[in-house]
Amino acid sequence: MSHSLNPLHAPQAGAIQGIIIALTAFLPILAIVSLAPAVPTLIQHFAGVPYVETLVPLMLTAPGLVIAIAGPCTGWLADKFGRRKLLLSATLLYGICGTMPLYITSLTGIFCSRLGVGLAEAVVLTIANTMLIDYFDDKQRRFWLTVQGVIGPALAVLVLASSGYLTALRWNGAFMIY
């Protein structure tokens, strides 16, 4: 990873940046929690696909695998291309790949979109945590890490309820959360 910024020239951030960084930590939770209520519906919808009972749960966890594989490289990419530019690009990729299952109907296509979500998450999480270190001193960092720990479970409950409702409306409704 990159070396620390010179404290005399370190960028300063306020509450808005802290909230944004805290919310980005919720993305991996969103990727898994949002689809959990949809698993039975997705298995039923793709009943004609061989091994669907295995493929749908794998699709659910695919972003985590990509995070584990791509995560170590994302710090280098952030240093090479710039944090802000890469963060914005990854956030756009997250939105595009997250909503793709609303427009595509093949399990393979949805699986690929989930891999894209994982790649975007790897970049967003790495850069967000790096920015937390860059922008905040130790005391502020502890505060924003606590905020992350508090809002994650609260948002997860909201996402679970919303996902269940949206899945009841249509087989791919859970992807509307993205």
State where each predicted segment sits.
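Cytoplasmic helix-loop-helix junction between adjacent transmembrane helices
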Residues: 107, 113-152
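Extracellular/periplasmic helix-loop-helix junction of adjacent transmembrane segments
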Residues: 38-68
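Helix-loop-helix hairpin linking two adjacent transmembrane segments in secondary transporters
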Residues: 109, 138-139, 147-178
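Conserved MFS/SLC helix-loop-helix module at the cytosolic interface between two early adjacent transmembrane helices
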Residues: 68-108
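Residue-level signature of the transmembrane alpha-helical cores
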Residues: 24, 87-93, 97, 113, ...
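Residue-level signature of mid-helix packing/kink "hotspots" within the transmembrane helices
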Residues: 33, 63-72, 122, 156-157
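Extracytoplasmic
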Residues: 16-50, 74
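Hydrophobic alpha-helical transmembrane and interfacial-helix anchor sites in secondary transporters
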Residues: 42, 77, 165-166
